Swiss-Prot record:
The keyword Membrane does not apply. The lineage of its organism: Bacteria, Bacillati, Bacillota, Clostridia, Eubacteriales. Belongs to the helicase family. AddB/RexB type 1 subfamily. One of its GO terms (molecular function) is helicase activity. The gene is addB. It comes from Clostridium botulinum (strain ATCC 19397 / Type A). Despite having conserved helicase domains, this subunit does not have helicase activity. Keywords: 4Fe-4S, ATP-binding, DNA damage, DNA repair, DNA-binding, Exonuclease, Helicase, Hydrolase, Iron, Iron-sulfur, Metal-binding, Nuclease, Nucleotide-binding. Its cofactor is Mg(2+); [4Fe-4S] cluster. This is ATP-dependent helicase/deoxyribonuclease subunit B.
Length: 1147
């Protein structure tokens, strides 16, 4: 019985020493068992290495074991396992059931139990307890030593859950985590390790369970040899936590304590001192890095490096692209094999998709060493969403998640038809399952669409029944059962009824034919996992009574614990993985990507259920559990050391300066540390683009990515830029290659591509727009924003998918409608705005809204609590608005005379006729919200008011650009009609926008009601253009003094208007605007009828017409495409606008 340490720094040859020692023992023909004990993840590599050292005849004399394998060997020899193992999925389902049963008895975790991930957290802490040999009884016996209620109650909850878990588990099962505890007990009876010599390699630490096993092995074996990656042995002394080798030295101390307690001999250690070490014999740079990375003081390496390189990149994509180029270069220039290369990162999740995409493009064979979650696999999605449909009562999300799995007998066209119908009509819940046929209706401006053809409606209902029938049957079968076992049986029957097993088998065969072996393996495993989870539910809680919702949660919990492990399909491929899963030292070349702060080294992990303080307190009381986060952070140093010393020939560290969203990333402290050691390190970057053939050569690698670079350079050449001669030779190579020539020619033709189609035939436009042209003024403004957007919306009549909701425009129309009805009711009752009773007015608003909802069958406003809130908000806004209108009218002499004044064939006034230069007449239609009149000095002054549910400014420059024409053309039309029809001398008074809102007034505690009302009036001040006449202005605001709080005007002390602080125009200027608006509309309409459909959105300093355009996917506007340019509109000062308008009218 003895223990011997084999120690040395990384790369010193410890593993090789073990293999050679085993070989020597075999050659010496010593008759004793020879065992190599390694971590589970290293067992495959260790077996390979052992076979390489030993010949086929002697290889069988040595066993390569992990602790788990050792346990199975002993159990097979002496017995001990009479029950089946429960996997992580079964444990999670059992824990969920225990927590649900005991949630009212939990003191700390009652609320936390509902949180996602809580079951996994509890499972992890129980695993931790078991690995540290802590039982529920030990926790209970130590409760009296715990001070502080929070920790005490926490441990009581954990003891309760842990105790019931153990009791229920051991009825039929055994936990995987119990294997080593049982192994330690059974080793006394085992004979296979008697007098054995054991080599233990690749461990940096052990759990208490493993120490118990080692103690028993030490008492039975001839000798145990343990490798320690350290510079020197600690020999039981105090360990400095800042020492990079502190985890190893802690392990050494614990092993020394075991042999001291058992009076076991300590053999002379084997010290593997080397310079250089075997691993770094071909690289002085890597040897220097190993020696100095964590040495203080360190020694500088002043020569230029070639084996250690750094790369600074613009983002993660260019980082991986540069990595791929470097891998290709190494393989071509230096004969490196893909299997000798590894790419690792501290953020595999963030890099996985980028690496997959880039490496596939560069034809680099690779395998991502990680277990895949199964939650997003279509089979799992189908099962869980089918149950979610029932547990959540047929919500849109759950139904279409189920239907879109691709595993049902519904094709994509049927899916789209059904989904469009459901979205347009807000179908959910009982509407899916009632016997009534669906009637086609949709919500838009309170009007039902025309009846859809009977064939389409019948088709929709057929698809509906085909979609819902299996789940309706499933629900029917669920209603007659209440046991977990029965739920599993019914679900399995459902899966068979939809032919899921056969469909999965067909998919697996298809994947194999297409060469997608990983996919085939994944789908094969998934079905087996589903069956395994159902079996475990039956065996663990099969006879317990549960509800459908509980069954859904239990199944979801069980499936969420599964991950799929895939086997590398070939040997010669680049290994891609996480820093923590780096498995082999047989790596020549290592790329560490994402060497950024917070990624490598990894940041401190969250403390979990037990905080650092909790762990320290429990440790002080004799309850040793896993290390706190600070201790783990110190141990991270050793992980960094192990990672950096893994490659034997070449190491490259790269870091981007920004992530995928453009957020700044800082380089890791590792970068600065290495730069200090290697003062002349090879450092590259792709941020500053260098010119020259040597730089261009870096972009020539595999055919596909090189082709992309070629096309980019050919485009530059076409556009007149100078490119390197090397691309001419590259172009010739692709021209001579049959596979590429067609693609090359096709893409070169694409250089002439433009998405522009500036004009189409007048005849076609006439067919689309109609003749004679009859359009609203708002459409004219739309054309000014972008001719193409107008064409798509009003020519092609393209519509966005209809959704059952109340859009902002719908809300505005609804409020306009209520205000119009209220205004007419006011007239009908013979009441005036300025004298009406406010209580009556508010009751009338309530009544009108309720009537409107009933009459129009607007189910949406009663469809949810949210829309009920919207209805209440609309009532408040409208009540505030009628109060505000009344206050405005009280302040002036203008009287409301017209409401919703319309210009149309059947309107209050005829359409506004605009004669084009060709003699053709265009009819403009529209509606004015309100017109107030003032009779004064033989003239009738008009105040035109437009109600707006959002903010709206009046800008003279927008009038100039044709973006704000409505109020001016309505003014012109009304003045013209008054003069021609009635002989009335009409004059412009004001054009105003009134915002419909109920603003919140802040800091009202010390304000009187009058002050609050004044604040609201000021907040809702109207915007627009006012006649520059002090007398008329006072007729709009008779208490004006200084700045008006209802209109955009400021008067001076002498009574005159402050033009610089007011939005005003003289009578002559209004007349000029009337002429200009007519001129502009004629120009726009002529352009429209000439077939102008140019993609030309406007752009101003505060935004562009593209910002909220729904047709961007149609036009694909991009300033990088030839001919795609914004129509830049400069915000001009009013003086400039007046000058430009006059110049245009003079032409």
């Amino acid at each position: 019985m003895s223990l011997r340490f084999i120690y040395g720094r990384a790369g010193s040859g410890k593993s090789q020493y073990c293999l050679n020692s085993i070989k020597n023992r075999i050659e010496e023909d010593i008759d004793r068992p020879l065992i190599l004990l390694v971590p589970e993840q290293f067992s495959f590599q260790a077996e390979k290495n052992l076979i390489e050292v030993l010949d086929e005849k002697t290889g069988f004399k040595t066993q390569v074991l992990s602790f788990k394998r050792m346990a199975y060997r002993v159990f097979n020899e002496v017995g001990g396992i009479t029950a089946k193992h429960m996997n992580e999925s079964g444990k999670s389902m059992l824990l969920y059931n225990i927590i649900e049963d005991n949630k009212n008895n939990l003191k700390v975790f009652k609320k936390a139990a509902k949180r996602q991930g809580f079951i996994t957290t509890i499972s992890d802490i129980i695993t931790e307890f078991k690995r540290y040999n802590i039982t529920p009884e030990i926790i209970l016996n130590n409760l009296e030593n715990i001070e502080g209620d929070n920790l005490k109650y926490k441990m009581e909850d954990l003891a309760l859950i842990f105790s019931q878990f153990e009791t229920r588990l051991h009825k039929n099962y055994i936990d995987n985590e119990d294997d080593l505890t049982i192994l330690a007990e059974k080793l006394n009876k085992s004979k296979q390790f008697d007098n054995a010599e054991i080599w233990i390699d690749e461990f940096s630490s052990f759990s208490p369970q493993e120490y118990s096993v080692l103690e028993k092995l030490l008492l039975k074996s001839y000798r145990i040899n343990i490798t320690l990656c350290t510079d020197y042995l600690n020999q039981g002394r105090f360990v400095d936590t800042t020492d990079v080798f502190s985890p190893i030295k802690n392990t050494e101390n614990k092993l020394l304590q075991i042999i001291e307690d058992n009076n076991i001999k300590l053999d002379k250690p084997i010290a593997l001192k080397c310079d250089p070490c075997a691993r770094f014999k071909n690289s002085a740079e890597l040897q220097h890095l190993e020696k100095n990375m964590f040495s203080f003081p360190y020694k500088e390496y002043k020569n230029e490096t070639k084996d250690i390189c750094m790369l600074k990149t613009l983002n993660q994509f260019t980082e991986i692209e540069n990595t791929a180029k470097d891998i290709i270069k190494l393989c071509i220039d230096k004969g490196c094999r893909f299997k000798d290369i590894a790419v690792i990162t501290g953020d595999l999740e963030g890099y996985e998709n980028i690496i997959s995409s880039v490496f596939l493009q560069y034809n680099i064979p690779f395998f991502i060493d990680k277990k895949r979650e199964i939650n997003n696999n279509p089979i799992i999605v189908l099962i869980l969403s089918a149950l979610e449909v029932l547990s959540k009562n047929w919500t849109y999300e759950s139904v279409f998640r189920y239907l879109k799995t691709g595993l049902l007998d519904i094709n994509n066209e049927e899916m789209d038809i059904l989904e469009n119908y459901v979205l347009a009509n807000g179908i959910k819940g009982y509407q899916w399952t009632n016997d009534k046929l669906w009637e086609y209706k949709s919500f838009s401006n309170y009007e039902l669409e025309d009846q859809v053809e009977k064939e389409l409606l019948a088709k929709i209902n057929d698809i509906r029944y085909k979609a819902m029938e299996p789940i309706v049957t499933l629900n029917k079968n669920f209603k007659s059962i209440d046991k977990a076992k029965e739920f599993c049986e019914v679900l399995y029957e459902f899966l068979c009824n939809i032919n899921l097993p056969d469909k999965i088998q067909n998919m697996i065969e298809d994947f194999k034919v297409e060469g997608e072996i990983e996919k085939a393996s994944e789908y094969n495993q998934i079905w087996n996992i589903v069956m395994e989870v159902l079996d475990q539910i039956v065996e663990v809680i099969g006879e317990e009574k549960i509800s459908l919702k509980e069954f859904f949660k239990i199944l979801q919990t069980g499936l969420s614990e599964y991950e799929i492990g895939l086997i590398p399909p070939t040997l010669d491929q680049v290994m891609v993985g996480s820093i923590t899963r780096l498995r082999s030292h047989n790596i020549n070349t290592l790329y560490i990507v994402g060497v950024n702060d917070g990624i490598f080294p990894s940041p401190l992990k969250e403390e979990g259920i037990l905080s650092d303080d909790d762990r320290k307190f429990l440790g002080d009381k004799g309850l040793e559990i896993a290390k706190d986060t600070k201790s783990i952070a110190f141990e991270e140093q050793f992980l960094v050391y192990s990672t950096l010393t893994t490659p034997s020939k070449y190491l490259r560290l790269s870091y981007p300066i920004a992530d995928g969203e453009g957020k700044t990333l800082r380089p890791s402290i590792i970068i600065s540390r290495i730069k200090k050691i290697f003062t002349n390190i090879c450092e590259e970057n792709d941020i500053v683009k260098l010119n020259g053939e040597e730089e261009e050569l870096k972009n020539i690698s595999s055919a596909k990515p090189t082709f992309n670079y070629l096309i980019s350079n050919l485009r530059k050449d076409v556009e007149g830029a100078k490119i390197d001669n090397i691309w001419g030779d590259t172009y010739k190579w692709y021209l001579e290659n049959e596979f590429w020539i067609e693609k090359l020619n096709r893409l070169i033709k694409g250089f002439d591509y433009t998405n522009q189609s500036k004009y189409i035939e007048t005849k076609k436009i006439r067919n689309l727009y109609g003749k004679p042209l009859k359009i609203s003024v708002s459409r004219v403004e739309k054309f000014s924003q972008c001719p193409f957007a107008y064409f798509v919306q009003y020519g092609l009549k393209a519509k966005d998918r209809k959704i059952f909701n109340l859009s902002y425009p719908d809300l505005g129309i609804f409020m306009h409608s209520i205000l119009e009805k209220f205004s007419h009711e006011l007239e009908k009752q013979g009441l005036e705005w300025d004298t009406m009773d406010l209580n009556w007015a508010e009751e009338e608003i309530d009544k009108l809204i309720n009537e409107e909802l009933d009459n129009k069958s607007l189910d949406i406003l009663n469809s949810s609590k949210r829309y009920e809130y919207v209805t209440k908000s609309v009532k408040k806004i409208l009540k505030r608005s009628i109060w505000l209108i009344g206050e405005h009218i009280k302040r002036g002499n203008f009287k409301p005379s017209y409401y919703e004044l319309s210009f149309d064939i059947d309107g209050d006034y005829p359409p506004i006729a605009m004669e084009l230069h060709s003699g053709e007449v265009v009819n403009l239609i529209g509606r004015v919200d309100r017109v107030d009149l003032l009779q004064k000095d033989g003239a009738t002054y008009l105040k035109i008011i437009d109600y707006k549910s959002g903010a709206k400014e009046f800008k003279l420059s927008d009038v100039y650009y044709g973006l704000q024409l409505q109020l001016l053309i309505y003014l012109d039309a009304i003045l013209t009609e008054l003069a021609e029809r009635s002989g009335i001398n009409g004059e412009p008074g004001a054009l105003l926008y009134l915002k419909l809102d109920d603003p919140i007034v802040k800091n009202t505690v010390d304000m009187s009601d009058e002050e609050i009302e004044k604040s609201i009036i000021k907040n809702l001040k109207m915007k627009g253009l006012i006649l520059n006449d002090p007398n008329v202005i006072r007729d709009m605001d008779n208490i004006i003094s200084g700045i008006s709080d209802i209109i955009p005007v400021m008067v001076k002390k002498d009574g005159g208007v402050s033009e610089g602080r007011s939005s005003v125009a003289t009578k002559e200027e209004f007349e000029t605007l009337r002429k200009y608006v007519r001129y502009t509309i004629i120009e726009i309409c002529e352009e429209m009828l000439e077939g102008n459909i140019e993609i030309k959105p406007y752009k101003k300093k505060d935004g562009s017409s593209c910002d909220y355009c729904i047709y961007s996917s149609v036009c694909k506007f991009d300033t990088n495409i030839r001919g795609n340019k914004y129509n830049i509109l400069i915000d001009k000062k009013d003086e400039e606008v007046w000058d430009d308008i006059k110049k245009k009218l003079e032409c």
